[in-house]
Amino acid sequence: MFTQIAKNMQFKMPLRPLLFVCAIGLFFSSCQKDASSEPKDLIDIETRNAAWTKLSIPGQLRGTSAIFGNIDDTLVVATMYKIYMTTDKGASWQMVSDAGLGIPSFSMYQGELMALSNFQDHSTSPFLFSLDHGKSWSTKGKYGYEVYDKVRVNRKETKISENESYKIIPQPNEIIDKEYGRPLAQPDKLARVTDRGEQLLDFPFRRQLNYIYHDKKNRLYIGAEGTRFEWSIKGNERTYPTSTDTAIIYISKLPISAH
């Protein structure tokens, strides 16, 4: 009888702690389920635009500074000092050169791709050269000064015909912050330029734009920074615009036809 009582006590004593452990287990299981049911990443609505494809390279403080090639084959992009390329439409990026010097433009001459070094609206002075469409780079070019001294690329305007071009239009800082009384920077715009003048495009993204380019299919490529033209608040500090470390490339899904 004593043995039977002892057995009953051994069974009954752990029951309440056991129920407590089970309750804790169910609680954490519920938390894990709720956490896993939430989306890990917020959806970037810019990637759902019907007219533009958006590509991003994270970890780039200065944004996209130069573009060459095309999205269907090989696209070469500079993010100020570094050169990246993609052959899978932006699904992955390979860094192919760390130039140590800012790259404002690319230019191609008879199979030689050149990285330029002058950050004027018209970039000049090639200093890096590639004979395999950007896969590898050298400081020694194939040609001489008689070729390289003539290289000029307008990084803010791309001409698709004799009478038609597309350009980046900086916007004046006309909006005044009520609290600090200073003008606020505004996002750049795009315009179509013909002999009839300039016409603003319906470009839906509020960004600082660094570069404009078109490929052989007359698709526009826009190099931009991740800067957002909105206030960010951290403690007692307010910052405008809000910087992010992302290089962005916008590509028109349809060609722009020359008229």
Task: Label every PLM stretch briefly.
Residues 2-19:
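Bacterial N-terminal signal peptides that target proteins for export
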Residues 32-259:
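Extracellular glycan-interacting surfaces
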Residues 27-30:
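C-terminal motif of bacterial Sec signal peptides marking the signal peptidase cleavage site
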